[in-house]
């Protein structure tokens, strides 16, 4: 019985943690999903962005008390403008997606929403990109990844 409880807790912690991608694994996945060069944004810039937004974690969340919104998933997509979490006041849902879908281990829906955002607002929509990636050499993010 004790072993079952421990096993259950371990499974729960894995479900809450989600998938944390390895850098090169994420690079390959983003490339397969068409982000390399999308709207002129290099794969290295996408990796830099996701490193600083979520540390490559699909289940990352960040609550923003000022706007009463939450950022979700590997790209930290905001519930005020881009996804529906059912609790953010006056949400727009620009990507027409549930915020929980942006935290799935399969990041296809998150990538589709990121493409929509970068198409409308450019990569500067992400504060972490402006703070940590813009005007920096980001080539190290794809270095050694055999793409």
UniProtKB/Swiss-Prot annotation:
An annotated GO BP: defense response to Gram-negative bacterium
Annotated keywords: Antimicrobial, Bacteriolytic enzyme, Digestion, Disulfide bond, Glycosidase, Hydrolase, Secreted, Signal
Domain C-type lysozyme positions: 19-147
SMART domains, per the entry: LYZ1
Tissue: Expressed in stomach.
Listed Pfam families: Lys (PF00062)
Localization per record: Secreted
Intrachain disulfide bonds: 24-145, 48-133, 83-99, 95-113
Keyword field contains Hydrolase: yes
Enzymatic reactions: Hydrolysis of (1->4)-beta-linkages between N-acetylmuramic acid and N-acetyl-D-glucosamine residues in a peptidoglycan and between N-acetyl-D-glucosamine residues in chitodextrins
Signal sequence, renumbered to the chain: 1-18
Active site residues according to the UniProt entry: 53, 71
Xref: PROSITE patterns: GLYCOSYL_HYDROL_F22_1, GLYCOSYL_HYDROL_F22_2
Family matches, as InterPro entries: Glyco_hydro_22 (IPR001916), Glyco_hydro_22_CS (IPR019799), Glyco_hydro_22_lys (IPR000974), Lysozyme-like_dom_sf (IPR023346)
Enzyme class, spelled out: hydrolase
Recorded family membership: Belongs to the glycosyl hydrolase 22 family.
The protein's role, per its UniProt record: Lysozymes have primarily a bacteriolytic function; those in tissues and body fluids are associated with the monocyte-macrophage system and enhance the activity of immunoagents.
Note: Lysozyme C is capable of both hydrolysis and transglycosylation; it also shows a slight esterase activity. It acts rapidly on both peptide-substituted and unsubstituted peptidoglycan, and slowly on chitin oligosaccharides.
Protein's name in the database: Lysozyme C-1
Native organism: Ovis aries
